[in-house]
């Protein structure tokens, strides 16, 4: 059994040792739910890593979006380089679900673009869970959506060993049943090729291709090879091949599923005709019978997931198989930013159900299509074992259910929560302008959060006209461009960033010394106690951090947020005084572009060389994206676009 081994140059400091000890004791005592209430910059991820290393349990870490999940994945990979740290998020680059709009009689077919690299990582996650114990999977809410049953996935696994069977024909049949494709020309992931008594397999999880050489009905040798040159890399005694798809179905169950679909179809057609819904009945019969024919002939059809209840042999209302079923019973779940992630998990089922109800009502799908769904919240609760909620502002749900609430208020850096000043709304724009100019003179950065997109645009325009280097961040900017804007702020290419909701990922910036919250007296989602505390935390990584709250009256949310911040600040300052700690700003490396990217002079490069450079850069960009280095990938992408335009 492999053990988790934490590798780090740091040791627990501040409140971390106490938090680690308390959480570990809670897990060992059998506590089902605990909360780590850690302020911004207190090293919550490092605390969780230490807990995992102490309790030695396979762990699922759930984040509320792909970008945050990618950041956590990178951090855990650094902490556990010798263990299996995996990434499991939706593999769609683009996804338009099937839908019907009755008001306009508009049917929208499902459209999707699958990211091959993320698909590889999903398979790597499930394979690690079925083959070893030292596994951490960082996931989005994709973990509550249906995938194939682990029993089927494991049953279709092919175990091969030198000096024994199965023979060549059995191996080929097994690969076909596992949804591998034969392709003797190309050799992509999830494909195999045959050359005489030699079979080469390119595994779905992306490890080097495997060459199997047969002598009669025995395996003579197994080795990994280079995909292009075919050169042998390493000889192996044995190897395990996992299925190319998460949905793999035995032939006998497929036939039973088709019969079950037929029975449901007849029942539903009778019901629709009795209600005089003849158009809906005709539509349903035509679509379903076509799908059934495809299943008989090909073993697959478009939208096969809508028949998942029949194909998996589940009963009506029975819980679908998800990533959680691939974990052993005694696993640990960590829900990051739980104040956002828990409501997201809770809401997935209802949103999916509403869309499916319309498709069923108008004859586009059988009623059983509703069973292709994410977990209900109660099913999710039953599926997890022990849970740690992690947040600077945990919600009522987490706090009410936790048997142990652990505060992590003291930061390892000695930084204290920023000083909060409340100022009147009248004249807020000009008052803030003078404060911004003071910070710019000191080489510091400023974040400003407004209530509306229009106000953010107008404020940016006004400050720009009076000489402030200011940019505006809005929801329509994609992830890579967002990373670039934040990097430009850190480099000092501009000094002030204005936005509506600056709580999202990637805004823990050591250079930011002032956060301004305009119109804080307007109660609502963006000015709730939780949102205000999160926004105040954006200034908590700089030793000169300060927050200005502009409010015409003291709302309950403002008072609670200020009171919480002042309480924490007092505790932190007292701790520093007792231990003689001098606070220091956090450090976060800003990745610079590589020299060759920055120094290329397009006019001096011959066309044929320019084409080669662009090809090299495109390969480098794909590598960066594959390694989840989004900042670097974005910079390379922009350089490619610049070269192409010239």
Curated annotation (Swiss-Prot):
Query: What are the residue boundaries of the UVR domain, all occurrences included?
Result: 611-646
Which terms are listed as keywords in the entry?
ATP-binding, Cytoplasm, DNA damage, DNA excision, DNA repair, Excision nuclease, Nucleotide-binding, SOS response
What InterPro entries does the record point to?
Answer: Helicase/UvrB_N, Helicase_ATP-bd, Helicase_C-like, P-loop_NTPase, UVR_dom, UVR_dom_sf, UvrB, UvrB_inter
The record's listing under CDD domains reads: DEXHc_UvrB, SF2_C_UvrB
- Per UniProt, residues of the Helicase C-terminal domain are 428-594
List GO molecular-function terms, semicolon-separated.
ATP binding; ATP hydrolysis activity; DNA binding; excinuclease ABC activity
Which biological process terms from the Gene Ontology are attached to this UniProt entry? nucleotide-excision repair; SOS response
Which SUPFAM superfamilies does this UniProt record tie to the protein? C-terminal UvrC-binding domain of UvrB (SSF46600), P-loop containing nucleoside triphosphate hydrolases (SSF52540)
The terms describing its cellular component in GO are: cytoplasm; excinuclease repair complex
Classification via SMART domains = DEXDc, HELICc
Query: Record-annotated residues binding ATP?
Result: 38-45
Q: Where in the cell is it found?
A: Cytoplasm
Motif Beta-hairpin positions after renumbering to this chain: 91-114
One of its Pfam families is: Helicase_C
Top-level taxonomic group: Archaea
Domain comment from the record reads as follows: The beta-hairpin motif is involved in DNA binding.
Record NCBIfam families: PRK05298.1, uvrb
Subunit comment: Forms a heterotetramer with UvrA during the search for lesions. Interacts with UvrC in an incision complex.
Q: What does this protein do?
A: The UvrABC repair system catalyzes the recognition and processing of DNA lesions. A damage recognition complex composed of 2 UvrA and 2 UvrB subunits scans DNA for abnormalities. Upon binding of the UvrA(2)B(2) complex to a putative damaged site, the DNA wraps around one UvrB monomer. DNA wrap is dependent on ATP binding by UvrB and probably causes local melting of the DNA helix, facilitating insertion of UvrB beta-hairpin between the DNA strands. Then UvrB probes one DNA strand for the presence of a lesion.
Protein name stated in the entry: UvrABC system protein B
Q: What is the lineage of its organism?
A: Archaea, Methanobacteriati, Methanobacteriota, Methanomada group, Methanobacteria
């Amino acid at each position: 059994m492999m053990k988790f081994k934490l590798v780090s140059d740091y040791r627990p400091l501040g409140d971390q040792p106490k938090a680690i000890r308390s959480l570990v004791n809670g897990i060992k005592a059998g506590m089902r739910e605990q909360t780590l209430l850690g302020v911004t910059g207190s090293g919550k991820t490092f605390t969780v890593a230490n807990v995992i290393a102490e309790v030695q349990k396979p762990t699922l870490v759930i984040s509320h979006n792909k970008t945050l999940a990618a950041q956590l994945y990178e951090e855990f990979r650094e902490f556990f380089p010798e263990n299996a740290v995996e990434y499991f998020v939706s593999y769609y680059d683009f996804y338009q679900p099937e839908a019907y709009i009755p008001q306009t009689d508009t049917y929208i077919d499902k459209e999707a673009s699958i990211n091959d690299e993320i698909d590889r990582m999903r398979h790597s996650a499930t394979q690690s869970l079925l083959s070893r114990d030292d596994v951490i999977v960082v996931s989005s809410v994709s973990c509550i959506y249906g995938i194939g049953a682990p029993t089927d996935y494991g049953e279709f696994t092919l175990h091969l060993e030198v000096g024994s069977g199965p023979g060549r024909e059995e191996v080929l049949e097994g690969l076909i049943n596992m949804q591998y494709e034969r392709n003797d020309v190309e050799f992509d992931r999830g494909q195999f090729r045959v050359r005489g008594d030699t079979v080469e397999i390119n595994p779905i999880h992306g490890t080097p291709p495997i060459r199997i050489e047969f002598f009669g009905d025995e395996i003579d040798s197994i080795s990994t090879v280079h995909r292009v040159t075919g050169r042998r890399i390493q000889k192996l005694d044995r190897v395990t091949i996992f299925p190319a798809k998460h949905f793999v179905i035995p032939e006998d169950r497929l036939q039973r599923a088709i019969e079950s679909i037929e029975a449901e179809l007849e029942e539903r057609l009778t019901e629709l005709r009795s209600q005089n819904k003849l158009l809906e009945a005709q539509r349903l019969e035509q679509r379903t019978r076509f799908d059934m024919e495809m299943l008989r002939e090909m073993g697959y059809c478009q939208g096969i997931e809508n028949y998942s209840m029949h194909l998996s042999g589940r009963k009506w209302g029975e819980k679908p198989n998800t990533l959680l079923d691939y974990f052993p019973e005694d696993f640990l779940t960590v829900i990051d930013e739980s104040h956002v992630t828990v409501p997201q998990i809770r809401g997935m089922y209802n949103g999916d159900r509403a869309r499916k109800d319309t498709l069923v009502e108008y004859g586009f799908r059988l009623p059983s299509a509703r069973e292709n769904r994410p977990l209900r919240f109660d099913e999710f609760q039953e599926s997890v074992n022990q849970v740690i909620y992690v947040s600077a502002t945990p919600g009522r749900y987490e706090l009410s259910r936790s048997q142990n609430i652990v505060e992590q208020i003291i930061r390892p850096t000695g930084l204290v929560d920023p000083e909060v000043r409340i100022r009147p709304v009248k004249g807020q724009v000009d008052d803030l302008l003078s404060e911004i100019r003071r910070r710019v003179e000191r080489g510091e950065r400023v974040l400003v959060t407004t209530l509306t997109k229009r106000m953010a645009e107008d404020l940016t325009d006004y400050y720009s006209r009076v000489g402030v280097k200011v940019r505006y961040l809005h929801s329509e900017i994609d992830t890579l461009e967002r990373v670039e804007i934040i990097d430009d702020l850190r480099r000092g290419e501009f000094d002030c960033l204005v936005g509506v909701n600056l709580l999202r990922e990637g805004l823990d910036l050591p250079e930011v010394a002032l956060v301004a919250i305009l119109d804080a007296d307007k109660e609502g989602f963006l000015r709730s106690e939780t949102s205000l505390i999160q926004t105040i935390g954006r200034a908590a990584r700089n030793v000169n951090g300060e927050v200005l709250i502009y409010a015409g009256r003291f709302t309950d949310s403002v008072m609670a947020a200020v009171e919480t911040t002042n309480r924490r600040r007092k505790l932190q300052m007292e701790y520093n005084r007792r231990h003689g700690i001098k606070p220091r700003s956090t450090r976060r490396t800003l990745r610079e572009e590589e020299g060759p990217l920055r120094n290329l002079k397009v006019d001096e490069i011959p066309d044929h060389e320019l084409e080669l450079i662009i090809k090299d850069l495109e390969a480098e960009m794909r590598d960066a994206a594959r390694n989840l280095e989004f900042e670097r990938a974005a910079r390379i992408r922009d350089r490619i676009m610049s070269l192409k335009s010239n």
